[in-house]
Amino acid sequence: MKPIKKSITYGRHTLTIETGEIAKQAHGAVIVSMDDTVVLVTAVGDKKTKPGQDFFPLTVDYQEKFYSAGRIPGSFFKREGRPSEKETLTSRLIDRPIRPLFPDGFYNEVQVVAMVLSSDTEIDADIPAMIGTSAALILSGIPFDGPVGAARVGYINNEYILNPTTTQLKESQLNLVVAGTQKAVLMVESEADELSEDVMLGAVTYGHDQMQQVIDMINELADEAGVTAWDWQPAEQDLSLVEKVTQLAEADLRNAFRLKQKSARVEAINEIWQRVFTELKVGTEEGPSEQAVREIGFALEARIVRNSILDGESRIDGRGTRTVRPITIRHGVLPRTHGSALFTRGETQALAITTLGTARDEQKIDALQGDYSERFMLHYNMPPFATGETGRVGTPKRREIGHGRLAKRALLAVIPPVEEFGYSMRVVSEVTESNGSSSMASVCGGCLSLMDAGVPLKAHVAGIAMGLIKEGNRFAVLTDILGDEDHLGDMDFKVAGTEHGITALQMDIKIQGITKEIMQVALLQAKEGRLHILEIMKQSLPIARESISVHAPRIIKFKINPEKIRDVIGKGGAVIRALTEETGTTIDISDDGSVTIACVSSEGGEQARKRIEDITADVEVGRIYEGTVLKLLDFGAIVSVLPGKDGLLHISQIANERVENVADHLKEGQTVRVKVLEADEKGRLRLSMKAASISTEITADNPDNTEK
């Protein structure tokens, strides 16, 4: 295939897609450029399904190469290692809008690899990677109902901005990524500064309208390349088997889905399918395959649950479509942590813990754009016991990283600036029970644990997950969805925010045909649920605690002369090391002279502060100091008046009478009162005990005398 190149103006940038030159052995490969950001995206599919495969094995790997930004990795091996959080989140961002567009029953393995080859610090590579994935899949001929477009939307001065730069995003009230086909929105991921539902919906529709030119460009590219589609057809369904399975299971499944408790419902459904498998002799030469029966079973379960809701009956757990499950809240549940909260909503429960730290505890991130640190962290963990299962426990999976990032987005808008609250903060959400919307429970629990720790949040933040059931023109929006409703429904729509507006929104749609009106209904219904949860949270913990935990570090901040920093550090760090060890504190000094002391004991903190102030203080001529004799000389003594500030006390300045032997009047380690008589250009001090004694007498005789 000869090289083909297409370009358009996309926002302020030039977007270019090229194919036919690089990675020609991949089934589909494109180079996507947005100004100086360049991404290679490839798509490869296995033309045969593995025996017994009963799910769609799609893998998306997004990789950021350090050479793309002219950098060498900072690790010991000097090469890229395991995926960073940014790479994991972008891989999920690419995966979510394309996964629903592969046909049902397509179980062939597909792998998408997106490699960042050149990185412009002003243009994130995620949008080019999403566009490139769509183009590579279309060119590959793999069964795929695309193409998909993608856009980033900002909101500055009440105007939407298409594909804002990194600099623009710093002043934007919105950072929203939307992806969709020509007719439908499929995915939204955003964080916002308490924006209204109308502004958020407007951003989604604006982004969808703007991406149409990208979809047209991909179609033109595919037409010119002459794509050959795979010869793939879904397996024909055995209608007689469908009828048998329906007869054996439908009535019992309807009864099982009326059980409100998840564990009882799951057990009943498992028993039904075990009986059906036995009666149909699944897995034997006489019976059907397990995969065929499971596919029919999933469709049957979906039909039962969906029709029940659309027909106006109650949901699985007996609620109406707008009802939030019962909520209970406890805070301060753990005695030694800095802040904690237990948030329970129905059968979903999150134990959130907040830990306060110093600037030294901030997360250091080695990114393409350069090193930076984050003072607010949120980590989400969901062990297998949360769903009554066994499984691997250890490093977080992609899902856990994604859920943690969503909860973090929701809370970022209310975190106080460092000038108001100098601590770094880490929230960990331990999901101890899960039956739908554990990420939104993490938002609520995380907010409450921060307030329990004494973090002065701007407002309470609550999150809620919405669902959708749609058949033809009939649809129902569900508030606070269960796990089964998420699994069997058409949309997972998570909204978090304050009483004033939305701070985070995530939408994943499994079908095409979700209209603007449906999204509007979902947003307004989500607001109703969010305000209900916020009211309960406020009743439990109206404001943040006025004081932090006794187990949290105290922070003391002040400034010193930047030229004196080296005096505090000392040779080889000896002075500051001794300070931290002797006072039990942690001390950080910035280049501008800002000093931060973290301590558990306030006495230790004040002691460290005084010693630093003494080290950095300038000796004043004419002032009297309490000094320490460091060394005796034949002609006097060396006396320290401040840390690192020593002077000569001449023998003639020790006493009013003549002194023959210095040792008769002084000894090393003795504390003496001395007055600074002179400081020369090199900082050498001349001291006097006689003058100090005279000044003291004058002050005693005349209290109005203010001599130093």
UniProtKB/Swiss-Prot annotation:
Provide the cofactor list for this protein: Mg(2+)
GO MF annotations, alphabetized: 3'-5'-RNA exonuclease activity; magnesium ion binding; polyribonucleotide nucleotidyltransferase activity; RNA binding
Q: Which Pfam families match?
A: KH_1, PNPase, RNase_PH, RNase_PH_C, S1
**Transmembrane region(s):** none
Q: Which residues form the S1 motif domain?
A: 622-690
Q: Cite the InterPro entries for this sequence.
A: ExoRNase_PH_dom1, ExoRNase_PH_dom2, ExoRNase_PH_dom2_sf, KH_dom, KH_dom_type_1, KH_dom_type_1_sf, NA-bd_OB-fold, PNPase
Q: What is this protein called?
A: Polyribonucleotide nucleotidyltransferase
Q: Does the keyword Cytoplasm apply?
A: yes
Q: Which organism is it from?
A: Nitrosomonas europaea (strain ATCC 19718 / CIP 103999 / KCTC 2705 / NBRC 14298)
What GO terms fall under cellular component here? Answer: cytosol
What the entry lists under CDD domains is as follows: KH-I_PNPase (cd02393), RNase_PH_PNPase_1 (cd11363), RNase_PH_PNPase_2 (cd11364), S1_PNPase (cd04472)
Q: What is its EC number?
A: 2.7.7.8
Which Gene3D superfamilies did the record assign? Answer: GHMP Kinase, N-terminal domain (3.30.230.70), K Homology domain, type 1 (3.30.1370.10), Nucleic acid-binding proteins (2.40.50.140)
Q: Into which family does the record put it? A: Belongs to the polyribonucleotide nucleotidyltransferase family.
Q: Which SUPFAM superfamilies match?
A: Eukaryotic type KH-domain (KH-domain type I) (SSF54791), Nucleic acid-binding proteins (SSF50249), Ribonuclease PH domain 2-like (SSF55666), Ribosomal protein S5 domain 2-like (SSF54211)
Gene Ontology BP term (one): mRNA catabolic process
